[in-house]
């Protein structure tokens, strides 16, 4: 699957995120894609409208369920190549890391491929 950014021009992505944010003020527009070279399944959809008060850990749980990942398999999500804190609210992560087009881009992987904030 090609990436959301490569499929849609910037102007279209920006217009869509602005429409979403004005229509759903307490939601965060998130694009969730599997990291390259990851061995876990592709998620069935990549666009999410996430409640602002959802934690990163709760979002990981949503993704885990959508890809039907067994409990013994690990999953990590990355925002700008860093591992966000599990207890962080998605709204706070969005405010800090949203793209110029207005979406928050999240990658997921079965391995800790990028390291964590403590290692950088």
From Swiss-Prot:
Propeptide: 116-120
Membrane topology field: Lipid-anchor
SUPFAM superfamilies for this protein: Ubiquitin-like
Gene that specifies this protein: ATG8
Organism: Eremothecium gossypii (strain ATCC 10895 / CBS 109.51 / FGSC 9923 / NRRL Y-1056)
Residues annotated as signal peptide: none
Subcellular localization, as worded in the UniProt entry: Cytoplasmic vesicle, Autophagosome membrane; Vacuole membrane
Gene Ontology molecular function, alphabetical: phosphatidylethanolamine binding
InterPro entries assigned: Atg8-like (IPR004241), Ubiquitin-like_domsf (IPR029071)
Function: Ubiquitin-like modifier involved in autophagosome formation. With ATG4, mediates the delivery of the autophagosomes to the vacuole via the microtubule cytoskeleton. Required for selective autophagic degradation of the nucleus (nucleophagy) as well as for mitophagy which contributes to regulate mitochondrial quantity and quality by eliminating the mitochondria to a basal level to fulfill cellular energy requirements and preventing excess ROS production. Participates also in membrane fusion events that take place in the early secretory pathway.
Modifications after synthesis and translation: The C-terminal 5 residues are removed by ATG4 to expose Gly-115 at the C-terminus. The C-terminal Gly is then amidated with phosphatidylethanolamine by an activating system similar to that for ubiquitin.
CDD domains given in the database record: Ubl_ATG8 (cd16128)
Family per record: Belongs to the ATG8 family.
GO BP terms in the entry: autophagosome assembly; autophagosome maturation; cellular response to nitrogen starvation; mitophagy; protein transport
GO cellular component entries: autophagosome membrane; cytoplasmic vesicle; fungal-type vacuole membrane
Keyword line: Autophagy, Cytoplasmic vesicle, Lipoprotein, Membrane, Protein transport, Transport, Ubl conjugation pathway, Vacuole
Lipid-modified residues, Phosphatidylethanolamine amidated glycine kind: 115
Protein name: Autophagy-related protein 8
């Amino acid at each position: 699957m090609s990436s959301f950014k490569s499929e849609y021009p910037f102007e279209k992505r920006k217009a869509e995120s602005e429409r979403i944010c004005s229509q759903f003020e307490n939601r965060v527009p998130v694009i969730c894609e599997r990291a390259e070279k990851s061995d876990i399944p592709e998620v069935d959809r990549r666009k999410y409208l996430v409640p602002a008060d959802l934690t990163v850990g709760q979002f990981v749980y949503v993704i885990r369920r959508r890809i039907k990942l067994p409990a013994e398999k690990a999953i990590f999500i990355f925002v700008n190549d860093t591992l966000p804190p599990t207890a962080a609210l998605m709204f706070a992560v969005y405010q800090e890391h949203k793209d110029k087009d207005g979406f928050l881009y999240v990658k997921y992987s079965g391995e800790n491929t990028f390291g964590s904030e403590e290692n950088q």
